[in-house]
């Protein structure tokens, strides 16, 4: 990771880490629910999605503060999806980010409700953002696109396709389609939302959308590679968990070398789309290299 990106990440990851639990503290809801919500929000993580939004805003020379609430709302939705993914009925994982998963601490019922609460509260947070208070059309766009990215035609639909793809060998295209929705749609939204807040042109929005799709794909390819040859201590979960869940992965379909070649191809395509956008691309280019080269 280059020094500029590292500095940006460190500064704003700390800000996001501190800000996320602050939204929950004053909610008029049972303490157990607040504790369960906060537990997973404070479990750490790369914060790639909120940082993508903030890096996009920065590239258009817009104030970072304008996007902080939205960035945190996206992370709440991502966190809800992880809580539910870890449940016994889904991936049945006991650890996440090096800690016991939510249902191991609070029980399955409370974990489900904590996820539900994070999902629904995120939309309340977006509609009360100062940055869109005087622009209802922009708020509507942001909410509609987030609902689409995280709902039945996006992340949830991708999760269903992933479950239905277990215990059978998928084609590479089927796997790409699953991860386009399961992982890529929310990543793409993070970038597009930053551009919408920055009043980007339709041409720039389209190039950023294509960049984001490629970035989401290479993010998942890298995840699959790390599941084969990563360090479980750095990953915060057991290596080889996908094999244990009988899931098709890029290495299982293409071999490890084939998956790495595919990673290189989509990294190049992502950069080509980004180069067409009229903005300061420094951070997003560096972030692309980071996603492709990360070790966790």
Model regions and ranges:
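N-terminal leader/targeting segments and the immediately adjacent pre-domain N-terminus
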Residues: 1-18
């Amino acid at each position: 990771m280059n020094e500029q990106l590292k500095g940006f990440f460190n500064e704003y990851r700390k800000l996001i880490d501190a800000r996320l639990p602050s939204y929950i503290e004053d909610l008029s809801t049972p303490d157990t629910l607040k504790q369960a919500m906060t537990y997973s929000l404070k479990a750490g993580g790369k914060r790639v999605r909120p940082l993508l939004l903030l890096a996009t805003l920065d590239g258009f020379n817009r104030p970072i503060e304008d996007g902080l609430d939205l960035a945190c709302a996206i992370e709440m939705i991502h966190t809800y999806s992880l809580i539910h993914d870890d449940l016994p009925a889904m991936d049945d994982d006991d650890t996440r980010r090096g800690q016991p998963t939510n249902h191991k601490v609070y029980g399955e019922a409370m974990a489900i409700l904590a996820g539900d609460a994070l999902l629904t509260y995120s939309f309340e947070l977006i509609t009360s953002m100062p940055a869109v208070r005087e622009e209802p059309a922009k708020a509507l766009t942001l909410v509609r696109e987030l609902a689409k990215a995280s709902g039945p035609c996006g992340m949830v639909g991708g999760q269903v396709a992933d479950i239905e793809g277990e215990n059978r060998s998928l084609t590479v295209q089927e796997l790409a389609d699953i991860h386009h929705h399961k992982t890529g749609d929310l990543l793409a939204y993070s970038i597009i939302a930053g551009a919408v807040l920055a009043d980007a042109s339709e041409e720039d929005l389209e190039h950023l959308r294509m960049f984001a799709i490629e970035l989401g794909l290479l993010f998942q390819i890298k995840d699959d590679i790390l599941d084969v040859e990563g360090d479980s201590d750095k990953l915060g979960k057991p290596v080889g968990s996908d094999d244990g869940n009988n899931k098709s992965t890029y290495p299982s379909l293409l071999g490890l070398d084939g998956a790495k070649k595919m990673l290189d191809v989509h990294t190049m395509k992502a950069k080509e789309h980004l180069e067409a956008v009229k903005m300061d691309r420094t951070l997003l280019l560096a972030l692309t290299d980071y996603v492709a080269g990360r070790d966790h």
